[in-house]
From Swiss-Prot:
Name under which the protein is recorded: Small ribosomal subunit protein uS4c
HAMAP family: Ribosomal_uS4_B
GO CC annotation, single: small ribosomal subunit
Keyword rRNA-binding carried by entry: yes
Role noted for this protein: One of the primary rRNA binding proteins, it binds directly to 16S rRNA where it nucleates assembly of the body of the 30S subunit.
Cellular localisation: Plastid, Chloroplast
Pfam families: Ribosomal_S4, S4
Subunit structure: Part of the 30S ribosomal subunit. Contacts protein S5. The interaction surface between S4 and S5 is involved in control of translational fidelity.
Species annotation: Watsonia angusta
Keywords carried by this UniProt record: Chloroplast, Plastid, Ribonucleoprotein, Ribosomal protein, RNA-binding, rRNA-binding
Listed NCBIfam families: PRK05327.1 (NF003717), rpsD_bact (TIGR01017)
One MF term in the entry's GO annotations: structural constituent of ribosome
């Protein structure tokens, strides 16, 4: 993880740690001139590691975004941001996306009153995300919400009621609220050159 954030910069979905300020400068000096391919590859890897996806999963999302109307890059980011594991992370119910994925896999999370154990579940507007009524589930979420550093930075497409352990998806995310500094066009370019 630390090698990844040193090489690619801050990845809030992967870990809360930040690279040291001088390490980015050292990387640029050590590596010399960066080719266009390397720049595109690094942006793709940044997206992959932040959301915790395999290469095949990311490729699938790129194909879905390519078939939809509109900007492929923007739609790709919207698809990734509306995943259940990412929504839990953005609500502050988990400290990282892998942590949110574990909560979902262990069946602690309900969407609209039904247990969902698929982290890639695509949330829609007006979805209500809650925890199971079990004490253990509530204790896990309570710890994350209490220690969540980004509670005040909640994006406008989400609302949370920390006392009832309930989150609400208001709308599809707007591109300015995406939690990762990334040039999504470079990711789309990377995949368009691969085929």
């Amino acid at each position: 993880r630390f090698k990844k954030i040193r090489r690619l910069g801050a990845l809030p979905g992967l870990t809360s740690k930040r690279p040291r300020s001088g390490s980015d400068l050292k990387n640029q000096l050590r590596s010399g001139k960066r080719s266009q391919y390397r720049i595109r590859l690094e942006e793709k890897q940044k997206l992959r590691f932040h959301y915790g996806l395999t290469e095949l999963q990311l490729l699938k999302y790129v194909h879905i975004a390519g078939k939809a109307k509109g900007s492929t890059g923007q739609i790709l980011l919207q698809l990734l941001e509306m995943r259940l594991d990412n929504i839990l992370f953005r609500l502050g119910m988990a400290s990282t996306i892998p942590g949110a994925r574990q909560l979902v896999n262990h069946r602690h999370i309900l969407v609209n009153g039904r247990i969902v154990d698929i982290p890639s579940y695509r949330c829609k507007p007006r979805d209500i995300i809650t925890t199971k009524n079990k004490q253990r589930s509530k204790a896990l979420i309570q710890n994350f919400i209490a220690s969540s550093p980004h509670q005040e930075e909640l994006p406008n497409h989400l609302t949370i009621d920390p006392f009832q352990y309930k989150g609400l998806v208001n709308q599809i995310i707007d591109s300015k609220w995406i939690g990762l500094k990334i040039n999504e066009l470079l990711v789309v370019e990377y995949y368009s050159r691969q085929t």
